[in-house]
Regions:
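Short, glycine/acidic-enriched loop or turn micro-motifs at the edges of active sites
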Residues: 14-16, 120, 157
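Acidic, divalent-metal-coordinating active-site segment for phosphoryl/phosphodiester hydrolysis
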Residues: 150-163
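A short, structured active-site edge motif that brings together acidic residues
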Residues: 113-125
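Acidic two-metal-ion nuclease catalytic site recognized across multiple nuclease folds
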Residues: 162-229
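Active-site catalytic microenvironments for nucleophilic, acid-base chemistry
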Residues: 103-106, 124, 140, 164-168, ...
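Conserved non-catalytic scaffold segment of RNase H-like nuclease domains
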Residues: 1-113, 127-149
Length: 229
């Protein structure tokens, strides 16, 4: 089993945690072939809902920046095409992978890849007491680290972190650096019916509850999750 010399490093910024509930706000990808960066991809994404304040503080991405950006369904095809058949790489790659698989399924597309998780490698090769977030790991391994919490710079940082760890630890650990099959189960989200929207609207009014996202931006699945609570 060989370590990967070619892959696509990916980082997403999102409105929160959980691919079934939250939305993508930014995509950054770095294509690496035979160890060298050959291409990059970057876009902001309109999540179709307000970005929470604490997320804006973390990422610097606000509603104004994304209001004219494409929706995820407009770019998921080119994201998949950019990746080709290469494995994907990221710091906690299942987070990003889950969002992309969900977006693909919603667009009646398939996105199935093997992947490399730099966070798992950090857990293997760093002392337990060391912080293992992307910035801390890059500092520990003397890998270049640009502005944290923007998608393209974080994707580049994950790539450089992988290369730095590989230089130090590849010998005898080939299997740890090899891409593994990623599995994320996603179901296509149903379009919300007018009846569902009205039912939720009436429920919220009756219970005097305010939603943080517009009802019109919610899928049928999301409305069901709220009304079932």
């Amino acid at each position: 089993v060989n370590a990967a010399d070619s892959y696509v490093a990916i980082d997403l910024e999102t409105t929160g945690i959980g691919a079934k509930r939250e939305r993508i706000t930014e995509i950054g990808m770095v294509k690496v072939e035979n160890g060298a960066v050959t291409d990059t991809y970057h876009t902001l994404v309109n999540p179709g809902r307000p970005i929470p304040e604490h997320i804006t503080e973390l990422t610097g991405i606000d509603d104004d920046m994304v209001k004219d950006a494409p929706m995820i369904q407009d770019v998921i095809g080119e994201v998949i095409a950019f990746c080709g058949t290469l494995p994907v790489l990221g710091h906690q790659i299942m987070f990003d992978y889950g969002f992309l698989v969900q977006a693909a399924v919603n667009g009646k597309l398939r996105f199935e890849r093997s992947g490399i998780d730099t966070l798992k490698l950090c857990r293997k090769f760093m002392p337990p007491e060391e912080k293992k977030n992307l910035a801390a790991a890059c500092a520990y391994f003397h890998a270049a680290q640009d502005t944290a919490h923007r998608a393209l710079s974080d994707a580049m940082a994950a790539h450089e972190l992988y290369q730095a760890m590989k230089r130090l630890h590849l010998s005898g650990n080939e299997d740890a650096f090899a891409p593994k099959v990623l599995q994320y189960k996603a179901k296509k989200e149903r379009q919300a019916t007018q009846r569902q929207k009205q039912h939720l609207h009436d429920l919220l009014k009756y219970h005097k509850i305010e939603l943080t996202v517009p009802i019109d931006s919610m899928s049928g699945n999301e409305i069901s999750r709220v009304t079932d609570r």
